[in-house]
Amino acid sequence: MRIYCVVLVLWMSAGASAQAPAPKRDLSGVWALQPAREVSEDDKQSPGGDIPPLTAWGKARYDLQKPGYGKRAAPGGNDPILQCDPMGFPRILYFPTPFEFAQISNRVLQMFERDHVVREIWTDGRALPSDPDPLWYGYSTGKWVDDTTFVIESTGYDDRTWLGATGFPHSETMRLEERYQRVDHDTINFTLTITDPQAYTKPWIALPRVLKLRPRAEIRQGYCVASEEQAFTKRIREPGALNTGKAPKN
């Protein structure tokens, strides 16, 4: 009977912990994007959802892209990350490595394991620049719209980055709206809207995703090493694209 009571108490404690409420206005911690059934193998580094039609400009850019793996894989792939160019945002968010949110007085820092990148999200009330010089990770501002929902708006992204590994393009005038709603202590519901009239005929509403807290995790130094990428491409990726049209991803 005593053993049964102990087990029952532990089970109830675990359940209570899982249902712990979200702290107010706090995203701090290491988070991992959860898998989604709706995401195909080819789309694992993309926003997913219903991809809108490309404009003529967008289609021309898309046709120039040569992915390193997937259905469109071909020898001579020109995915920028194959030579260790920055992955860019939002693609890095969908890469299967965690990231950490840290909050300081006038910014939220989003620190990614991939390339050990730090993204700054300003929370001091400033407006986005109207005509910014493009950057790999753009310019971002954020605000709390209620006690559990943080909204980020951003623009000024370098158009050399791709929206996923299959080569979907974007322009320098792309604007993003991200919503991070912390629904309980361990869970964030994430939504993304991409607005880029130069590349797409209507806004791209990304597939809603879930982020889970990883309380014991630490962000490692996951740098892209050019010599390792080149060796992997020569030994595995290029032969895979040539033989099957589906070069493996590293």
Residue ranges and their predicted role:
Residues 1-4:
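Positively charged n-region of N-terminal signal peptides that target proteins for export
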Residues 18-250:
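PEST-like low-complexity, intrinsically disordered acidic/proline/serine-rich tracts
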Residues 13-15:
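N-terminal signal peptide c-region/cleavage motif recognized by signal peptidases
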